[in-house]
């Protein structure tokens, strides 16, 4: 007979093949990283999986961290539909759901696990179909941005007197997803995930957001680039996010592994998509044929609640010189240093700094146009990779596990060879302050103030202000 059970009583026993066992409620009494470590041991079939790095005092402290309490409430809100034994199904699904929530590349705007999960009779496979309704309403004044996302690059210069104020709302971000969680003798724990939402053309058309598979240390599919550190990004209600981050989704194959509980390394081969400003007369963009390569090395402490990461990106950008009838390959690269620091159990600090040449299509602001390769001044038929620099500073404070606030300050700067002295983008500034309230584990509301500025090389500038309100239901 089919039955439905709630995960309100959490009981997890994670056992490696040498019988190293985590006690009940281990995911709560250890940080996100500790749980992830246990799961990776299971997926890899590791011979030894020790939790000696977390003493009783540290575990007790981590159990009170608001993020862990919040994750516990999310997992509690998932119901099981299956024909197996209730206790076995509950334990198995809770362990599988941890792989869903404890993810290096999980974004703060990603949907929560489905409200209902179907469990196989063997309790080794769970599948759920979920949805997310997200409505944002916003009001711009003293200059408005003509798009839903708050992007400083899109601030009009000069101000349009017919659009000094703007009231609008968007369902962009509303969507559906399917996830499959399971365990196999050879693969270990695995996950498949497909997500679509209505953030396509005009903010309403259906768009594929993610489609990937994970098994052990491997990920393959359409997923977040390895160059991005989502955990170091302060959360925003605004869909665009801080303009200084590097954010992109690519078709990729990634390997990621953690050593001795402190170090994580990852590398990926990612299918390219360059953005080249060829004029079609003297220069022409060539098809991409060399994959982008991304990697990072990360050191974590405080049970994984804090980390510092160095990320790198390498790519080849190809164009044709129409005057000399020759193709040229330009090397593009990017470096990023990012961190999240848990200064107090309820207080987090965030920081990101990046620099590169020819990586502009990975940034938030400069991806709005073609900046990977631009015209070389004074040399017809030649292109080069300009430099761009970005940074993000942020903080987050939990008043309670269900009420928290974020602040974010960000800048993106563009450095061409020569000062063009025209209306070309020079830098953009972005600021956000918000407040979130989880009324229930699946119903969230929030409000946010946004301020932005765009400065051009000819010293003309524009600014914009926005108040955004959001409500979100995940099911």
Segments from the language model and where they lie:
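N-terminal periplasmic/intermembrane-space "pro-region" immediately following the signal or transit peptide
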Residues: 23, 27, 55-141
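Surface-exposed loop/turn segments flanking beta-strands in extracellular/periplasmic regions
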Residues: 148-158, 371-377
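Detector for outer-membrane/organellar transmembrane beta-barrel domains
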Residues: 299-419, 425
């Amino acid at each position: 007979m089919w039955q439905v059970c709630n995960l309100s009583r959490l009981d997890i026993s994670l056992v490696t093949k040498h019988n190293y066992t985590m006690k009940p409620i281990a995911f709560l009494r250890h940080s996100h990283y500790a749980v992830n470590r246990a799961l990776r041991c299971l997926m890899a079939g590791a011979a030894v999986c020790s939790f000696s790095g977390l003493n009783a005092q540290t575990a007790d402290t981590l159990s009170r961290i608001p993020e862990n309490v919040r994750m516990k409430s999310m997992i509690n809100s998932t119901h099981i539909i299956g024909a197996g034994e209730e206790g076995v199904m509950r334990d198995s699904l809770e362990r599988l759901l941890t792989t869903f929530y404890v993810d290096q590349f999980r974004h703060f705007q990603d949907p929560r696990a489905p409200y209902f999960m179907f469990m196989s009779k063997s309790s080794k496979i769970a599948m759920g179909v979920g949805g997310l309704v997200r409505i944002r309403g916003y009001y711009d004044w003293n200059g408005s941005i003509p798009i839903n996302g708050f992007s400083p690059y899109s601030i009009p210069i000069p101000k349009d007197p017919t659009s000094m104020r703007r009231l609008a709302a968007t369902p962009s971000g509303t969507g559906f997803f399917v996830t499959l969680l399971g365990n196999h003798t050879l693969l270990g724990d695995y996950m498949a995930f497909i997500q679509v939402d209505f953030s396509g053309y005009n903010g309403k058309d259906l768009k594929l957001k993610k489609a990937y598979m994970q098994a052990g240390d491997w990920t393959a599919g359409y997923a977040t680039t390895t160059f991005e550190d989502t955990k170091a990004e302060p959360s925003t209600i605004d869909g665009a996010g801080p303009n200084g981050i590097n954010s992109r989704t690519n078709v990729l194959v990634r390997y990621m592994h953690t050593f001795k509980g402190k170090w994580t390394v990852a590398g990926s081969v990612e299918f390219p998509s360059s953005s080249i400003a060829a004029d079609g007369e003297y220069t022409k963009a060539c098809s991409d044929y060399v994959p982008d390569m991304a990697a990072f090395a990360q050191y974590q402490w405080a049970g994984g609640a804090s980390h510092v990461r160095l990320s790198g990106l390498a790519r080849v950008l190809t164009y044709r010189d129409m005057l000399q009838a020759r193709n040229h390959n330009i090397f593009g690269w990017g470096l990023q240093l990012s961190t999240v620091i848990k200064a107090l159990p309820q207080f987090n600090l965030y920081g990101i700094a990046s620099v590169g040449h020819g990586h502009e299509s990975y940034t938030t602001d400069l991806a709005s146009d073609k900046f990977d390769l631009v015209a070389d001044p004074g040399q017809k038929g030649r292109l080069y990779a300009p430099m761009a620099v970005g940074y993000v500073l942020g903080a987050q404070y939990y008043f309670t596990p269900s009420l928290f606030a974020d602040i974010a300050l960000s800048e993106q700067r563009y450095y061409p060879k020569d000062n063009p002295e025209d209306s070309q983008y020079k830098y953009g500034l972005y600021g956000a302050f918000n407040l979130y309230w989880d009324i229930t584990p699946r119903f969230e509301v929030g409000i946010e103030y946004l301020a932005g500025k765009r400065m051009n090389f000819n010293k003309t500038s524009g600014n914009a202000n926005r108040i955004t309100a959001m409500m979100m239901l995940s099911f």
